[in-house]
Swiss-Prot record:
Keywords: ATP-binding, Ligase, Magnesium, Metal-binding, Nucleotide-binding, Purine biosynthesis. InterPro entries: ATP-grasp, ATP-grasp_carboxylate-amine, ATP_grasp_subdomain_1, PreATP-grasp_dom_sf, PurT, PurT/PurK_preATP-grasp, PurT_C, Rudment_hybrid_motif. The gene is purT. Mg(2+) binds at residues 266, 279. This is Formate-dependent phosphoribosylglycinamide formyltransferase. Involved in the de novo purine biosynthesis. Catalyzes the transfer of formate to 5-phospho-ribosyl-glycinamide (GAR), producing 5-phospho-ribosyl-N-formylglycinamide (FGAR). Formate is provided by PurU via hydrolysis of 10-formyl-tetrahydrofolate. It catalyses: N(1)-(5-phospho-beta-D-ribosyl)glycinamide + formate + ATP = N(2)-formyl-N(1)-(5-phospho-beta-D-ribosyl)glycinamide + ADP + phosphate + H(+). One of its GO terms (molecular function) is phosphoribosylglycinamide formyltransferase activity. The keyword Ligase applies. Belongs to the PurK/PurT family. ATP binds at residues 100, 141, 146-151, 185-188, 193. HAMAP family: PurT (MF_01643). Homodimer. It comes from Bifidobacterium adolescentis (strain ATCC 15703 / DSM 20083 / NCTC 11814 / E194a). N(1)-(5-phospho-beta-D-ribosyl)glycinamide binds at residues 8-9, 68, 286, 361, 368-369.
């Protein structure tokens, strides 16, 4: 089994796969990445370089390829799938989910899922026209980017030029001179966001309890499960998540692939109670780290089992915490330049119902997510406070 991307999420999936007897090689753009520290072997390469990726496939001859990042030469994934390798969840799904245009067309125009009003643009003039149609304020994003890169909120026509420039500079790796298409969509009256982890396996498709979240500049900072919402919101969220994943899996199966794995379906809940589709991550989701404290099987264990063809039923995705309680996660982001040394860990974990996962990334340059605090509490506020206290109690030195 070959991992493309060896971050903290891949590390947890690698551990779960090895518990089930899988042999794992973890690849990334640098040595010492979290999953590389626990895998049987590792490789370092530019995964967006088709020649390097093809050479890696020829060397390893993987039975299963697990993309854990988006900056990958997807043409080589498709070629590997054509040669008989199992790409997780599929080469076709990976290509769709990294392209906002293809994903939005599938979700809204083919599957009929509700979304914000949107337009696509391949030039500054088209962006101006699209923004006029969807109205201000609006959001402009590159077709291909992640973690909020290249995204901006535009409140008037005067800011459109700057938004176009931001999108071009923040898009995924590209050749100099290329122009990236963008999506411009109406800024919805958002109440909150949800993630619905949805699992496709040999037994079909099941959904986990929705996860609440807090973000900063497009990056996950906190999550909690189960989130609090009305029965109507739950029904809408589960329907949208299941329909989106069913549509993606159908695309995979049409190309002869399996489509098995965990999907993080991102949803907007509006102030009027309506739920909109936003995006899908075809792999375990950042916000799903809370499942290490909340579920019988974490999103990582579910992903590993689904990949290997084991059946996942609703019983496998059940919460493991006492009824009425809530689990929370709190990302620990470190700023500086050098190696991070964690101190005061014993005091930070003194409160019952708390835990910590240190990712052991080699260095920090600027700011980087280096660990996550976990907690179980009597309600959402209690769980979030306990996880936050763990994060605040740590003494993290840059050495």
């Amino acid at each position: 089994m070959l991992f493309l991307g060896s971050g903290e999420l891949g590390k947890e999936v690698t551990i779960e796969l090895m518990r089930l007897g899988a042999w794992v090689c973890a690849a990334d753009s640098y040595a010492g990445a979290p999953a590389q520290q626990v895998a049987h072997e590792y490789r370092v390469l530019d995964m967006a370089n088709a020649d390097q990726l093809r050479a890696l496939f020829d060397e390893i001859q993987p039975d299963i390829i697990v993309p854990e990042v988006e900056a990958i030469a997807t043409s080589e994934l498709a070629a590997a799938a054509a040669r008989g390798a199992q790409v997780v969840p599929s080469a076709e799904i990976a290509a769709i989910c990294m392209d906002r245009e293809r994903l939005r067309v599938l979700a809204h125009e083919e599957l009929g899922l509700p979304t914000t009003p949107y337009r696509f643009a391949g030039s500054l003039e088209e962006l101006r026209e699209g923004a006029q149609i969807v109205g201000y304020p609006c959001v402009v994003k590159p077709i291909m980017s992640s973690s909020g890169h290249g995204q901006s909120v535009v409140r008037s026509a005067d800011a459109i030029d700057a938004a176009w420039t931001e999108a071009q500079e923040g898009r995924r790796a590209h050749d100099e001179g290329d122009v990236s298409r963008v999506i411009v969509e109406a800024l919805a009256p958002l109440d909150y966001e949800l993630t619905v982890l949805t699992v496709s396996s040999s037994a079909g498709i099941v959904t986990c309890a929705p996860i609440g979240q807090r973000q900063e500049s497009g990056d996950y900072r906190e999550s909690w499960q189960p989130a609090t919402f009305t029965p109507d919101v739950l029904e809408q969220a589960q329907h949208i998540a299941r329909t989106a994943v069913e549509g993606l899996v159908a695309k995979a199966q049409a190309s002869g692939e399996k489509g098995w794995g965990v999907f993080g379906v991102e949803l907007f809940v509006l102030t009027d109670g309506n739920v909109l589709f936003n995006e899908v991550s075809p792999r375990p989701h950042d916000t799903g780290m809370v499942t290490m404290a909340s579920q019988r099987l974490s999103e990582f264990a579910l992903h590993a089992r689904a990949i290997l063809g084991l059946p996942i039923t609703q019983e496998h995705v059940a919460l493991s915490i006492p009824e009425g309680t809530v689990a929370a996660s709190h990302a620990i982001v470190v700023q500086g330049d050098g190696e991070a040394e964690f101190r005061n860990v014993a005091a930070a974990l003194a409160e019952p119902g708390t835990d910590l996962r240190v990712f052991a990334k080699p260095e920090v340059h600027g700011h980087r997510r280096m660990a996550v605090a976990l907690a179980v509490g009597g309600d959402e506020a209690d769980a979030r406070a306990k996880a936050g206290n763990v994060a605040e109690s740590l003494d993290i030195a840059i050495v």
